[in-house]
Amino acid sequence: MAFEEAIKRVFMKRICMKCNARNSWKAEKCRKCGYSNLRPKAKEARA
């Protein structure tokens, strides 16, 4: 169960598409630049 908790802590973030800042999962807009286009953090590594 601890592994699932770690996964949740690491990946339950939103990334700003403008400045790449990490934001909380509940965020509506970026904490650094105020941009509202946030994506979920990628769970799979890109090739």
Curated annotation (Swiss-Prot):
Recorded hits in InterPro entries, A to Z, give: Ribosomal_eL40_arc (IPR023657), Ribosomal_eL40_dom (IPR001975), Ribosomal_eL40_sf (IPR038587), Ribosomal_zn-bd (IPR011332)
Natural source organism: Methanococcus vannielii (strain ATCC 35089 / DSM 1224 / JCM 13029 / OCM 148 / SB)
Q: Which Pfam families match?
A: Ribosomal_L40e (PF01020)
Q: Which family does it belong to?
A: Belongs to the eukaryotic ribosomal protein eL40 family.
Gene Ontology biological process terms, A to Z: translation
The uppermost taxa in this organism's lineage are: Archaea, Methanobacteriati, Methanobacteriota, Methanomada group, Methanococci
| Keywords from the UniProt entry | Ribonucleoprotein, Ribosomal protein
The Gene Ontology terms for molecular function here are: structural constituent of ribosome
Superkingdom of the source?
A: Archaea
GO cellular component terms, semicolon-separated? ribonucleoprotein complex; ribosome
Q: What is this protein called?
A: Large ribosomal subunit protein eL40
State whether keyword Transferase applies.
Answer: no
Q: Where are the transmembrane segments?
A: none
